[in-house]
């Protein structure tokens, strides 16, 4: 009986549900005091995300506090890099730092195929524990970074405002970039399969920086590798719902739907009704409340959620923010978001 399955999983599969499921990107993180206290005790991000006890505890913090409909693995999109031979660290206030940025074909040729069970057994352990702990009260989500976004980090060596280094590679040495992207696509597909086999019920691919590409370059350097990941995962796990998120995606929404994903996660810069008009009926949506709204009042949060859900009615919809919750967000407003999301049908009425 599918009613015994988690609400988010049923909604992501396109079943008729009593309300849109709700979770938040970065729902485990700095806006929560309990997380900040743990961070003070364990200042290394890599330790927090790679020690299975800490990763599990952090993943569960928002579940204990707010009971979201999805519990996402606490990790990072860069976590698989060392398994391919790329070292990195995440420095507080500076973000990711790549020890030896990839700029040559020789460096790409030297990369190892990713074997997640060997290089990241902690991920499998945490996902299994999450499934056991939340049962059918929430769906367990796994996630990865998409090939283009991983390439942007490893070529630039760090976060970037203008992506000049990787853009230079796009236009001067595209053959190096294509080989790197292909390696990442194969590895990321393996990583997602491992996550699903370990307990992830729904998966999301973040192509955070693909919004920096023109549509033509998106078609060349992002979409084919997104599609390769999706195809490889769907070949072995056809029933696992697949979400794709891009920050700044308003110009490529239709292209996102062509990658084979089940759900397009929208940022807040596009109107929900207008986005749905641009997407085929079978494609679901996730989002797309402005995370900045969570600095407002509970009444404003409720009104905006109502508007978002009203516009998405009749379509497969997962309520979320249009980006990760921002550091400094009042924790009580995170709670208000979940409360308003769970009670939305009391205000709007009828079945989704």
UniProtKB/Swiss-Prot annotation:
Catalysed reactions listed for this entry: uroporphyrinogen III + 4 H(+) = coproporphyrinogen III + 4 CO2
Keywords assigned by UniProt, alphabetized: Cytoplasm, Decarboxylase, Lyase, Porphyrin biosynthesis
- Point out the signal peptide segment: none
Localization: Cytoplasm
Q: Which GO terms describe its cellular component?
A: cytoplasm
Q: Which GO terms describe its molecular function?
A: uroporphyrinogen decarboxylase activity
EC numbers for this chain: 4.1.1.37
Tell me the route in metabolism or biology where this protein functions.
Porphyrin-containing compound metabolism; protoporphyrin-IX biosynthesis; coproporphyrinogen-III from 5-aminolevulinate: step 4/4
**Entry keyword annotation includes tRNA processing:** no
- Into which family does the record put it? Belongs to the uroporphyrinogen decarboxylase family.
Query: What protein am I looking at?
Result: Uroporphyrinogen decarboxylase
Which species does this protein come from? Answer: Synechococcus sp. (strain CC9605)
């Amino acid at each position: 009986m599918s009613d015994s399955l988690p609400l988010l999983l049923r909604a992501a599969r396109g079943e008729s549900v009593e309300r849109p499921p709700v979770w938040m990107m970065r729902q485990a993180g700095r806006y929560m005091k309990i997380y900040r206290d743990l961070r003070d005790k364990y200042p290394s991000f890599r330790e927090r995300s790679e020690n299975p006890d800490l990763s599990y505890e952090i993943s569960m913090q928002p579940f204990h506090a707010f009971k979201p409909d999805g519990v996402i693995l606490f990790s990072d999109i860069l976590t698989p890099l060392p398994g391919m031979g790329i070292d990195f660290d995440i420095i507080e206030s500076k973000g990711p730092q790549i020890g030896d940025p990839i700029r040559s074909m020789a460096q790409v040729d030297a990369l190892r195929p990713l074997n997640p069970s060997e290089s990241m057994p902690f991920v499998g352990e945490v996902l299994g524990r999450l499934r056991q702990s939340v049962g059918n009260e929430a769906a367990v989500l796994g996630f990865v970074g998409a090939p283009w976004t991983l390439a942007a980090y490893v070529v630039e060596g760090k976060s970037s405002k203008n992506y000049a280094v990787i853009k230079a590679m796009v236009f001067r040495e595209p053959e190096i970039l294509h080989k790197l992207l292909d390696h990442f696509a194969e590895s990321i597909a393996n990583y997602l399969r491992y996550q699903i086999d370990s307990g992830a019920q729904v998966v999301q691919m973040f192509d955070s920086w693909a919004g920096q590409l023109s549509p033509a370059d998106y078609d060349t350097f992002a979409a084919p590798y997104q599609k390769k990941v999706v195809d490889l995962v769907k070949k072995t796990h056809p029933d696992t719902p697949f979400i794709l998120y891009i920050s700044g995606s308003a110009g490529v929404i239709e292209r996102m739907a062509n990658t084979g994903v089940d759900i397009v996660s929208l940022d807040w810069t596009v109107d929900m009704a207008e986005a749905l008009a641009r997407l085929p009926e079978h494609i679901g949506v996730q989002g797309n409340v402005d995370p900045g709204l969570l600095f407002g009042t509970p009444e404003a949060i409720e009104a905006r959620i109502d508007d978002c859900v009203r516009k998405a009615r009749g379509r497969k919809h997962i309520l979320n923010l249009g980006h990760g919750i921002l550091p400094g967000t009042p924790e009580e407003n995170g709670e208000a978001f979940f409360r308003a999301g769970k009670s939305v049908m009391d205000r709007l009425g009828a079945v989704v």
